[in-house]
Amino acid sequence: VAGLRLGPLLRYADPSSATVWVEASRPCTAEVRCADGAGGTARTFQVAGHHYALVPVSGLTPGTTTAYEVLLDGRSVWPPPGSRFPPSVVRTPAEDGGDAVKVAFGSCRWAAPPADTEDTVGPDALDSLAARLAADPGAERPDALVLLGDQVYADEVSDAVEQRIRARRGLADAPGAEVADFEEYTWLYYESWLDPEVRWLLSTVPSCMIFDDHDVIDDWNTSAAWLADMRATPWWRERLLSGLMSYWVHQHLGNLSPAELAADPLYAAVRATPDATDVLRAFACRADADPASVRWSYRRDFGRVRLLMVDTRAARVLDEGRRAMLDPGEAAWLREQALQDRGSYDHLLIGTSLPWLLPHLVHDVEAWNAALCRGERGARWARFGERLRRAADLEHWAAFPASFAALTELIAEAGSGADAPATVLVLSGDVHHAYVAEPRWPGGSGSGSDGGPDARVLQLTCSPVHNSIPLSIRVGFRFGWSAVARALGRRFAGHGGCARPPVTWRRTGGPWFGNQLMTLALHGRSARLKLEQARGKGTLAVVEESDLTSR
């Protein structure tokens, strides 16, 4: 008899359709059956001995909320008997796209420990959100949960996962107490997504995901020298291929709409073979050999809100002479999606796990380091720069100066002119604190008050959902925004011969430290921001609330 091993995850919802992801214990037919008669079925596909399905749900009524159940080979497996949570539901937007849209986002989540053990990093923001929604099912809830990277930590496993690794293969050989292959990756997803609160939350709130480094390894693709060192190890290839395969199965597949899934040749090939392990492994090999041949970035439209989720890890160009955050094809895709039919959206959200605008000292140090690494101060400084880059995680947009300038230019273009949206908002995580920063253009197109774009442009950074915030991070990032730090940063930039960035910016909110989520409420051309921190089981405290469209 087929059982439900993981899920369900409600991944996509539009006015008339949805997708629901599950893992079953054996091959079977998965069915989603809605209370209003809508539904769908899908046969499981197999990867490395595991059985998955992404069920397309059709026939939904726009602007409604309907409960659903999951059946495997005709037997109901969700909701579980005696569940303490309300029924899982699919909530569809109205056909005209005129509804208010709420988008919650954050990044960096260690799996919460079992309920009977102490949580050393404090309450989990997703657990707290789930508890609040479960306590009042009629309360306002996000229309989408945007998870901006580090959904799992392949290089920082829990004690429980480490014990399983020790029992399976020992810890003597590299990568030791880190994930080695696809099977061990599945343990991370079980640990994270079987958390009862998170499991229910992901079953009833649609989610969008993108990887960051820890989904594979810390500093993933930080430089060409780093990659060469990793490829020289005996364990890296299996780790990377397994990371990409498990990401495709658990996260990427659900990012796609039913129409995109129907046109996806890899998805068709995976479903057409009794065991898709080799098919998916060949895909991961191609992604490793030629990253430009694969696109992990994607677009989601929520009525008149456009979300572009950008891959800032696998799409990099690492050659020091032409270093870029995005390869040419990826950059062209981002530009096309941002500028296409601009009059059809009121808000443009750019999801990039790595922040565009950083504290000024951090930005200048990253630009200086990039100059050293490309040899601007000679070979000795280049070697020092590479060591520093890895030790200090100097790999955000500022560490790719040409890409920083190109993104800045694209944001200005997308936000200017008669068809400009009300806002262009860059959503990021990674840095284990939250802040709001606003750029200021020295001139250029648009009729904005500062000579920049007509749209309100902001960097919104929110991290972590559930992770540690060492004192050094708190002190360092507070200092990084100060006038003294800005002056110090200019000294570094001068030493590297760095050009001034094309915009200046100032911090307008934060820094805030804690396990937290930001939520955008977007309606017509108005936008409001709320930052909430987890303060206890089921408690999210509002620490900031502001109107983003009034200047």
Residue ranges of predicted features:
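Metal-dependent phosphoester/phosphodiester hydrolase catalytic core
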Residues: 1-551
